[in-house]
Amino acid sequence: MNLIAAVDKNWAIGCKNKLLVSIPADMKFFRETTTGKVVVMGRKTLESFPNGQPLKKRVNIVLTHDKNFKAGDAIIVHSIEELREELKKYPSEDIYVIGGETIYKQLLDDCDVAHITKIDYAFEADAYFPNLDEMPEWKITQDSEEQTYFDLEYYFVKYEKQVQ
């Protein structure tokens, strides 16, 4: 399974249920990487999308404790166990965990690849991604050249979990 996220220099991912910054090249990378695949998210992540609707051209799976929650054609699950059962229907390499903070932490151990856009700036934030640089089992296997968006510098980095 894969994780995909944009993080700042403190591994922050959001503030007040919004992304820290919207970088067009990062959004394009996200679209190209996840289109036609399975995306897994929490309810608050889904609600942060335009009109709170599932992403087009993807299988959307939403984890929520709210038994009455519905969202378009999204598949709704209510526990990690139910989510893991649902995910067995899909090839692991086609599954992308897209947030937010709680879902990333809950599914980190199930994943073996992380596509991280690292932004060289510290934003005000209240949601964080686990710091993969502090986890010896996660190694950088690809690192892009420095990219810029106005005065922000960022990199596309691929981490892979090493089998211990």
Feature names for model-found ranges:
Residues 1-164:
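Enzymes that bind and transform nitrogen-containing heteroaromatic metabolites
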